[in-house]
A protein has these predicted regions:
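Anionic ligand-binding catalytic core segments
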Residues: 1-50, 54-55, 59-165
């Protein structure tokens, strides 16, 4: 069930933000951990500069027999990540990157979600180097693009750490 469909569990009251309405629907569906799980997903989107996490690009699992809500579906559709449509020279950790679904910029969405994220950030140590190696081996990039993406990912990891402190 997409998040857009899930958010129809109850009507959105006037003056209630989409973020608060989403959390109200999670509570109504008995999914108390969903806020944390969505924040973790959006944190990954921030680090990878995913620009297309709209309400149709994540969702929830239900038991097909009992219709009980089971939780957040695994992450899917991250195809507009890693500065995919950005010229190499413009790739930067602090560049303005649009966000969805709860804010319009990734910086403002990061401020919204940071208090709820519980990712073990120490597991990201060395991630940007591994990403660089994978991109250099697998992709048909121009010279320096993999290194530029890796540096930007590392910068975003560091900015995320600062926002969590």
């Amino acid at each position: 069930v997409t998040a857009a469909q899930f958010m129809r569990l109850q009507p959105q009251q006037q003056g209630v933000s989409n973020w608060q309405h989403f959390n109200n629907c999670c509570n109504a569906g008995g999914l108390s951990d969903a806020q944390k799980e969505v924040c973790n997903m959006l944190a990954a989107d921030y680090i990878l500069a995913n620009t297309d996490r709209h309400l149709g690009n994540f969702g929830f699992l239900r038991d097909s027999e009992t219709l009980e809500w089971k939780g957040l579906a695994p992450i899917y559709d991250s195809g507009t990540s890693l500065w995919q449509m950005t010229l190499t020279r413009a790739i930067s950790a602090d560049a303005m990157v649009p966000a969805k679904p709860f804010e319009t910029s990734q910086q403002s969405q990061l401020k919204l979600i940071a208090p709820y994220v519980d990712l073990p950030l120490e597991r990201l140590d060395g991630f940007s180097g591994k990403a660089k190696d994978i991109l250099e081996d697998a992709a048909q990039f121009d010279d320096g693009r993999a290194a530029k993406i890796a540096a930007a990912v590392e910068g975003r990891i560091q900015m995320f750490r600062l926002n969590r402190a």
